[in-house]
Amino acid sequence: MGRKPSPRAQELPEEEARTCCGCRFPLLLALLQLALGIAVTVLGFLMASISPSLLVRDTPFWAGSIVCVVAYLGLFMLCVSYQVDERTCVQFSMKVFYFLLSALGLMVCMLAVAFAAHHYSLLAQFTCETSLDSCQCKLPSSEPLSRAFVYRDVTDCTSVTGTFKLFLIIQMVLNLVCGLVCLLACFVMWKHRYQVFYVGVGLRSLMASDGQLPKA
């Protein structure tokens, strides 16, 4: 009869599977979510400070705030009570909640990218001029009563056509990367859940077949 491996030897492969260069891979995703969420939030408030007439959808600090909440939950779960094979209802509930919030973060980031891309496409066509303490922009049109977009409290239109346009590009890039990180977090949570399930089924069937073998 072969010697059974010790419980410590059985735990080593499982611990190695949870780590990546000494750090748990889901933990890296949560840290990335936190860094990107803070960057998107700060940049959103900077964009809002350019003009009070900007809509909330054009300054997506709300997207960064949601991703920060997701990251805080992920850090708490991964640093305190994370187990690949959840053993309590609390661990399972936290993993499901983190999965759902990451999916929400993905949708919100993609929505922020769409809003920023739409506003950027408008700015690329605008013809702007300074009027008193505002910047008035119009789309090129042959109609004399074409719609005008007014950015209040702007003394120089270059802050709209230059600085704000650059902020929109950065927001699109940051939110796109943030959405991809949230998607990867959803995939990791799903993979851990169902990979552990099928591995557990395989181990039980293997143990059952070993138990049916005749003893030497």
UniProtKB/Swiss-Prot annotation:
Give the membrane topology, semicolon-separated if more than one.
Multi-pass membrane protein
Q: Which InterPro entries match?
A: CD20-like, Sarcospan
Q: Where in the cell is it found?
A: Cell membrane; Cell membrane, Sarcolemma; Postsynaptic cell membrane
**Alphabetical keyword list:** Cell membrane, Membrane, Postsynaptic cell membrane, Synapse, Transmembrane, Transmembrane helix
Bilayer-crossing regions: 27-47, 60-80, 96-116, 167-187
Q: Which residues form a coiled coil?
A: none
Ranges per topology, Cytoplasmic: 1-26, 81-95, 188-216
Q: Which PANTHER family match?
A: SARCOSPAN
Q: What is this protein called?
A: Sarcospan
Record the organism: Mus musculus
